[in-house]
């Protein structure tokens, strides 16, 4: 048995004894025949940011071969707002490397994520998955390096409050049972996500924890490991689908919404990134942040206003991006600083062998911790279109390598203080601000669209569609208009409760 696969929780990987990246059509057919799979699901992202599903009953091996080889037709105009009904037929083709056994299906079912193709059999230019693929390709062409990412998926679980072992309001970070009520739900989600191919780092309860009208609202987080950016997006999409389905099965409600009530922590979708060459992390040089990393950060500093168009996509997003809520408001970056937009977290750069210190019986670890360093974009939230967001971040990081003054920009936007403290008001006032509404975000995207359309990454039609949707909210003054009105705020929250 391959020791690298011996602990892999994906049932197909365990059965075939090969990595999912090496799955072929023959492997899928073999697994279906040998394990009694009776149905196949095609799953694919649509314009609302959710996975859609097409079910197939396996009639015979010839039919199975046909759907795996040819895919199936779908109505693109019902999936994406930018596709006209008169020319809306698209193909969806399964990607065998994404195969997993549906953990919720009563009938044994194998599911796969799909790619979109147009009538000519070419990848659909404006599809979410293809946009991200093009962004990663352009990043590699410009830099000679590869772009990796991982997400921190925050969500609230909502259920009747038993009144027992009440947690401290807004103090739920890393809380344990019985004060944290949904640890078992989270760990079951993690197990299912891992079975579906998700590379999970860890899970924990988060800051948000409160009760309203006899209901407990508990915030949780599942954080992933850095992988190729396309895989990172796929894993986040499947994870959201799994969390919602398990909640539905158990009678809980779930929301990834950026804001669910005034004065309480909203849910973000922080994205960590690292740049890799020949399998080696390029974020550090001699134990400090490298010029490569600082160029990527400079690109994000420049394009941060328009990245909100992909990562903060409904009006409640901008009620989260306010001071003192552990969410960024200004365009800056720093080390281990949670008041900034881009944070450089601890990266195990210490010289000591902490494992040996904690465990005196252990020898020298000799572990290469340089692979761990990432940088984190903190503005996105659960309303994000995950593929567009990570594509936008790949574009921004690439853009930093196309700027002659990237290192100067990085130096100018660096901060090492809490910018929201009174004594740092001068520094705060010197920094550019993020947009404060969907309409303002649309304006920023329109001004900076050339960077995203360069190298044919984002299609003009997609950018036009995003701008049109953001402006349709008419929310330019909404934050000021209803900021102190709890009733109107709750109406807004309810409208976008199940976003993304």
Locate the predicted segments by residue.
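Generic beta-structure capping elements
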Residues: 225, 276, 345, 486-488
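Histidine-centered divalent-metal-coordination microenvironment in nucleic-acid enzymes
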Residues: 113, 152-166, 209-223, 257-279
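Short acidic (Asp/Glu) and glycine-rich catalytic loops that position anionic groups and cofactors
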Residues: 7-11, 167-169, 270-281, 366-373, ...
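Active-site capping/gating regions of soluble enzymes
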Residues: 17-18, 26-48, 52-120, 124-141, ...
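A hydrophobic, small-residue-rich beta->alpha segment in the mid-to-C-terminal subdomain
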Residues: 373, 380-382, 393-452
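Short hydrophobic/aromatic-rich motifs at helix boundaries and adjacent loops
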Residues: 1, 161-162, 212-217, 362, ...
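ATP/Mg2+-dependent ligation/transfer catalytic cores
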Residues: 1-210, 227-241, 252, 388-389, ...
């Amino acid at each position: 048995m391959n020791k690298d696969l011996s602990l892999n929780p994906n049932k197909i990987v365990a059965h075939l004894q090969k990595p999912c990246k090496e799955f072929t059509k023959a492997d899928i057919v073999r697994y279906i025949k040998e394990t009694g799979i009776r149905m196949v699901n095609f799953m694919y992202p649509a314009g609302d940011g959710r996975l859609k599903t097409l079910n197939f009953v396996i009639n015979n091996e010839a039919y199975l071969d046909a759907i795996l080889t040819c895919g199936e037709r779908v109505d693109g105009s019902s999936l994406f707002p930018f596709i006209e009904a008169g020319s809306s037929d698209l193909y969806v083709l399964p990607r065998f490397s994404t195969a997993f056994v549906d953990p919720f299906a009563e009938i044994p079912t194998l599911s796969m994520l799909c790619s979109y193709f147009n009538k000519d059999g070419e990848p659909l230019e404006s599809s979410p998955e293809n946009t991200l693929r093009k962004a990663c390709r352009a990043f590699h062409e410009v830099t000679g390096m590869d772009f990796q990412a991982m997400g921190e998926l925050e969500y609230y679980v909502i259920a009747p409050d038993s009144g027992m072992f009440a947690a401290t309001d807004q103090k739920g970070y890393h809380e344990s049972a019985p004060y944290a009520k949904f640890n078992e739900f989270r760990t079951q989600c993690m197990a299912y996500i891992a079975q579906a191919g998700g590379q999970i780092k860890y899970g924990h309860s988060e800051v948000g924890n409160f009760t309203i009208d006899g209901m407990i609202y508990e915030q949780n987080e599942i954080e992933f490991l850095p992988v190729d950016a396309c895989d990172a997006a796929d894993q986040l999409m499947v994870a959201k689908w799994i969390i919602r389905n398990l909640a539905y099965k158990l009678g809980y409600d779930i929301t990834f919404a950026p804001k669910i009530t005034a004065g309480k922590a909203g849910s973000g979708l922080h994205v960590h990134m690292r740049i890799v060459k020949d399998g080696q992390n390029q974020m550090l040089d001699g134990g400090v942040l490298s010029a490569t990393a600082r160029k990527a950060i400079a690109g994000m500093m420049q394009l941060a206003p328009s990245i909100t168009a992909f990562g903060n996509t409904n009006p409640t997003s901008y009620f989260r991006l306010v001071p003192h809520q552990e969410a960024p408001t200004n365009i800056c970056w720093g080390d281990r600083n949670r008041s900034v937009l881009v944070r450089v977290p601890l990266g195990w750069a210490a010289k000591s062998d902490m494992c040996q210190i904690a465990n005196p019986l252990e020898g020298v670890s000799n572990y290469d911790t340089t692979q761990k360093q990432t940088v984190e974009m903190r503005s996105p939230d659960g309303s994000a279109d995950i593929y567009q967001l990570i594509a936008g971040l790949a574009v921004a990081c690439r853009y930093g390598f196309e700027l002659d003054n990237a290192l100067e920009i990085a130096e100018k936007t660096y901060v090492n203080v809490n910018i929201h403290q009174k004594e740092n008001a001068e520094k705060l006032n010197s920094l550019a601000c993020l947009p404060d509404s969907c309409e303002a975000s649309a304006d920023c995207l329109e001004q900076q669209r050339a960077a995203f359309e360069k190298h044919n990454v984002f299609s003009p039609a997609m950018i036009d569609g995003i701008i049109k949707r953001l402006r349709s909210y008419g929310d330019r003054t909404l934050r000021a208009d209803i900021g102190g009105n709890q009733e109107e705020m709750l109406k807004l929250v309810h409208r976008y409760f199940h976003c993304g």
